Curated annotation (Swiss-Prot):
A motif (GyrA-box) lies at residues 528-534. It comes from Staphylococcus aureus (strain MRSA252). This is DNA gyrase subunit A. The gene is gyrA. InterPro entries: GyrA, GyrA/parC_rep, Gyrase/topoIV_suA_C, Topo_IIA-like_dom_sf, Topo_IIA_A/C_ab, Topo_IIA_A_a_sf, Topo_IIA_dom_A, Type_II_DNA_Topoisomerases. Residues 813-822 have a biased composition (Acidic residues). The lineage of its organism: Bacteria, Bacillati, Bacillota, Bacilli, Bacillales. The keyword Thylakoid does not apply.
């Protein structure tokens, strides 16, 4: 092996060499391969292909030429890379599902939406489309700069004139070193309207531009969900746009349905999309699909048919397909383009500004070129006019000259002509000496003078030049503009909501004393007779018990109000569905409670944006507040303040109202006050509230509810020892807010303090929950109706150390099976009810029963009348002062 001479060996630090070489490579990829120019929207390979087509004369009015011929010419003259990369770039420009406005008119197999590749270049043919001519128009009028090709033997354009904004019209995508670009296509009509608006108002905002440019317009049509992603991308250059297929649910007879997809998202491979759907069905991740077929054809266009099982919900299946397949996907916008040869992230306005400046430059340079040509021609015509005026002398001078050179010099000296004028006279044919030709020269000269004046006016006034740009853009819009294909659906779609995948059904959400939460289908609990055994609703932890329960739809909102006056929000389906015996999950795993924060009220709401509804709050110290429901529509997982109060107070309950109801506030010592809701003026979300009831010593608020002014409803009172009764609402007279209230029950050791005061119609079911986790569901109509001073009847028999922890109303379900024992009739014909209780200390959970006469002997009516009289006297002598603490 021969030794290399030392002079040819250059020692370099490998770190420096790697750094410099990689930087050179990276810049080459960025500037000369992967990123489009902001002015014409083309990468070098695309620009070279189009210029090659133009140089070969492959215009739309000419016949197609073999693709191999085009690729070979481009590769040999301008693009010294692989022929396959050139052909693939040309194929993409010919695909109407890849380019919104195809730049190559291909003949043959140029691929499909299923990912099929194009035929070999020896089989396909191509030429330019009509709109491509507008990218190249005036390229030979010094409108752009030309540069040397790779070997210096040819010249190629550094950028195309681009009479329409191709960067945004057809979009671009590319991966460079350390950066990538992904620009969506747009509608040409909207783009040009946006450029026109920008030209008239340079200070236009992006929001105003979006009045002209609604958003991307994909060649495959489809849907765009919401405008927030579009706005973010237009303002910052980066964003995510949600795309969705266009699908309809059709009836196919026999009560069966099918889903028909007619448009798919941009850049989605249809065949792979169908394979993904089939895979999900095969893996049983999507249930209810019986058949899947592709009926796409040239006649019908895209048509993917999905047959749905008869008992399946087609809407839920479609939403699952959106969630789990490319039927819905996102387009990540990253608007990076070359600006003055450097990669830059640009927003919508910057892209249009750079394009408009490019057009002004193109029109200015073209005008300057035309002006030079016009002046050159006028200069020649001036010489011809001189020659025609002195034709005999001209002929004599030429005849006397020995050579052409002498003749030219003689003409220049004698008639003060320039070299070009003298040469034009020598080149003039004899037939132009006729009178007719003389008139033509005069007419052409006068027209040129007018034309020169017009061109000079354009160059002298920037506004005139700008108007010319507008006129040319308007012409392009009128010739090539079309209707938008992609529909933008408004409504704040950022992503497919989980509730779209979940059937709407009634559920029960329970919350335990130790803050464990879960949901169950409402059908889990069976309607039972008063005094029934109950259903074990959960297995509680030691010293834990169910404290709250609400019924709602899976799609409804649940507002959680805490003792500290904060509010949190969840959807019904966001609470985990667990078994009936499960204790649930810690509520802090669902909402972010603060330390020592306890949920005091759960309330179900369907429409948080309602302007007709209000929330009424009551605290333990008797403070009450009314606030519009819409104030609570923007609640996040961290929660927000719902009401402010003193440190020694806490929130007891919240109720949803219509704004025209009566407020009922009840206390643990069985006092109840009723006053019109209208006496509470609406306050802000964080306001404190005003006094609702004056409390006696040791008393506190335990219940809050509402009733209509002329309501036939009843007040249901339940005590901690399992007693309850119904009393007509009208037995409680209206009084002033802030009073002490009137008696609603007689409190004894037998029935205990009041734990629940609420209104009922008699058509509900009642769920009573004990601290042992026992839940009983009974018909409210089975509860006796008694006077205000009555103690009530036994609703549930409790074991030792058991007490009623919470009570909730649920809708009565006539179809639910009643599995409890029916009412029995005693020997004397008196109707009786059988009561039962689960005693956890009894082996085998034995059920103890006893028969209780349903007729309850109330206290003497005179006691109630006397108590009512004393309440009225006490209320009349009380000062009715309102403490408006806000």
């Amino acid at each position: 092996m021969a030794e290399l001479p030392q002079s040819r060996i250059n020692e370099r630090n490998i770190t420096s060499e790697m750094r410099e070489s990689f930087l050179d490579y990276a810049m080459s990829v960025i500037v000369a391969r992967a990123l489009p120019d902001v002015r014409d929207g083309l990468k070098p390979v695309h620009r070279r292909i189009l210029y090659g087509l133009n140089e070969q004369g492959m215009t739309p009015d000419k016949s197609y030429k073999k693709s191999a011929r085009i690729v070979g010419d481009v590769m040999g003259k301008y693009h010294p890379h692989g022929d396959l990369s050139i052909y693939e770039a040309m194929v993409r420009m010919a695909q109407d599902f890849s380019y919104r406005y195809p730049l190559v008119d291909g003949q043959g197999n140029f691929g499909s939406m299923d990912g099929d590749g194009a035929a070999a270049m020896r089989y396909t043919e191509a030429r330019m489309t009509k709109i491509t001519l507008e990218l190249l128009r005036d390229i030979n009028k010094d409108t752009i700069d030309f540069i040397d090709n790779y070997d210096g033997n040819e010249r190629e354009p550094s950028v195309l004139p681009a009479r329409f904004p191709n960067l945004l019209a057809n979009g671009a995508s590319g991966i460079a070193v350390g950066m990538a670009t992904n620009i969506p296509p747009h509608n040409l009509t909207e783009l040009i309207n946006g450029v026109l608006s920008l030209s008239k108002n340079p200070d236009i905002s992006i929001a105003e531009l979006m009045e002209d440019i609604e958003g991307p317009d994909f060649p495959t049509a489809g849907l765009i969900l919401g405008k927030s992603g579009i706005r973010r991308a237009y303002e910052t250059g980066r964003g995510s746009i949600q795309m969705r297929s266009r699908a309809v649910i059709e009836e196919r007879g026999g009560g069966r349905q099918r889903i028909v997809v007619t448009e798919i998202p941009f850049q989605v491979n249809k065949a792979r999309m169908i394979e993904k759907i089939a895979e999900l069905v095969r893996d049983k991740k999507i249930d209810g699909i019986t058949d899947l077929r592709d009926e796409t054809s040239l006649r019908t266009g895209v048509r993917v048919v999905i047959d749905v099982r008869k008992d399946a919900n087609a809407s839920v299946i479609l939403n699952n397909l959106y969630k789990q397949t490319p039927l819905q996907t996102s387009f990540g916008v990253n608007m990076i383009a070359l600006v003055n040869g450097r990669p830059k992230l640009i927003n919508l306005k910057e892209a249009l500004v750079h394009y408009l400046e490019h057009q002004k430059t193109v029109v200015r340079r073209r005008t300057q070129y035309n002006l030079r040509k016009a002046k050159d021609r006028a200069h020649i015509l001036e010489g011809l006019r001189i020659a025609l005026d002195h034709i005999d002398e001209i002929i004599s001078t030429i005849r006397e000259s020995e050579t052409d050179k002498v003749a030219m010099e003689s003409l220049q000296q004698r008639f003060k002509l320039s070299e070009k004028q003298a040469q034009a006279i020598l080149d003039m044919r004899l037939r132009r000496l006729t009178g007719l030709e003389r008139d033509k020269i005069e007419a052409e000269y006068n027209e040129l003078l007018n034309y020169i004046s017009e061109l000079e006016a354009i160059l002298a006034d920037e506004e005139v030049l700008l108007q010319l740009v507008r006129d040319e853009l308007t012409e392009i819009r009128d010739r090539f503009g079309d209707d938008r294909r992609t529909e933008i659906q408004l409504g704040g779609f950022e992503d497919l909501e989980d509730e779209d995948l979940i059937p709407e059904e009634q559920i029960v959400i329970t919350l335990s004393h130790n803050n464990y939460i879960k949901r169950l289908p409402v059908s889990t609990y069976r309607a039972q007779n008063r005094g029934g055994r109950g259903v074990q609703g959960m297995n509680t932890l030691e010293e834990d018990f169910v404290s709250q329960l609400v019924t709602l739809s899976t799609h409804d909102h649940v507002l959680f109000f805490t003792n500290k006056g904060r509010v949190y929000k969840l959807k019904g389906y966001e609470v985990p569905e667990l078994s009936r015996q499960s204790k649930g999950i810690p509520v802090v795993n669902a909402i972010e409670l603060e330390n020592d924060e306890i949920i005091s009220t759960m309330i179900a709401v369907k429409d948080l944006e309602s302007e007709d509804n209000f929330l009424v709050f009551a605290t333990k110290r008797g403070v009450v507040k009314r606030s519009a429901l819409s104030n609570f529509s923007r609640i996040n997982r961290n929660g927000k303040i719902a009401i402010s109060f003193r440190e020694d107070d806490e929130l007891i309950a919240v109720r949803l109202t219509s704004g025209q109801e009566d407020i009922l506030i009840g206390t643990s010592h069985a006092s109840l006050i009723r006053f019109p809701e209208s006496t509470l003026r609406p306050l802000g979300r964080t306001a404190t509230g005003v006094k609702g009831i004056t409390l006696r010593e040791g008393d506190e608020v335990v219940g809050l509810d509402v009733a209509h002014a002329n309501s036939v409803d009843e007040v249901l009172v339940v005590t901690e020892n399992g007693y309850g009764k119904r009393t007509p609402v009208n037995d409680y007279r209206l009084s002033n807010r802030g009073g002490k209230g009137i008696k609603t029950a007689t409190i004894t050791e037998r029935n205990g303090n009041v734990v629940c005061i609420t209104t009922v119609t008699g058509e509900e079911d009642l769920m009573i929950v004990t601290n042992a986790g026992v839940i009983i569901r009974l018909d409210v109509a089975d509860i006796s109706q008694n006077g205000r001073a009555a103690q009530g009847v036994r609703l549930i028999r409790l074991g030792d150390d058991q007490f009623v922890s919470t009570v909730a109303k649920v809708k009565e379900d006539a179809d639910e099976e009643n599995e409890d024992e029916q009412s029995t009739v005693s020997e004397d014909g008196t109707e009786q009810q059988r009561e039962a209780v689960v005693n956890d200390e009894t082996p085998g959970n034995a059920i103890h029963t006893e028969v209780i006469d349903s007729e309850v002997n109330d206290e003497d009516g005179r006691i109630e009348v006397r108590q009512d009289f004393m309440d009225r006297v006490e209320e009349d002598i009380q000062q009715s002062s309102d403490d408006d603490e806000e």
